[in-house]
């Protein structure tokens, strides 16, 4: 055990608090750089979840849709644990059918 680990243990410091603060700051910066207001971001999140839920059952309690910034590039990241696919019958619209081969 290093001296720093001993002092941290003695003072019961939470090593994760610095990481949590860093993640929060990155989230704030991502929101600022993307120029998306919170209402629009929430609407996007709901719509993304709605579309994904049409095809697979997702665990909403464990899921997360967020903005992440790396090297001045902001990305919308959806981390959605999939429970199982939803059974669907394949429908082909008349306009999508292939023309008959001669």
Swiss-Prot record:
UniProt keyword terms in alphabetical order: Cell cycle, Cell division
Entry-linked Gene3D superfamilies: Cell division topological specificity factor MinE (3.30.1070.10)
Cysteine pairings via disulfide bonds: none
GO biological process: cell division; regulation of division septum assembly
Pfam families assigned to the protein according to its UniProt record, in alphabetical order: MinE
InterPro entries: MinE, MinE_sf
Similarity remark: Belongs to the MinE family.
Chain's role: Prevents the cell division inhibition by proteins MinC and MinD at internal division sites while permitting inhibition at polar sites. This ensures cell division at the proper site by restricting the formation of a division septum at the midpoint of the long axis of the cell.
Protein name: Cell division topological specificity factor
Organism expressing this protein natively: Synechococcus sp. (strain CC9605)
Taxonomic classification: Bacteria, Bacillati, Cyanobacteriota, Cyanophyceae, Synechococcales
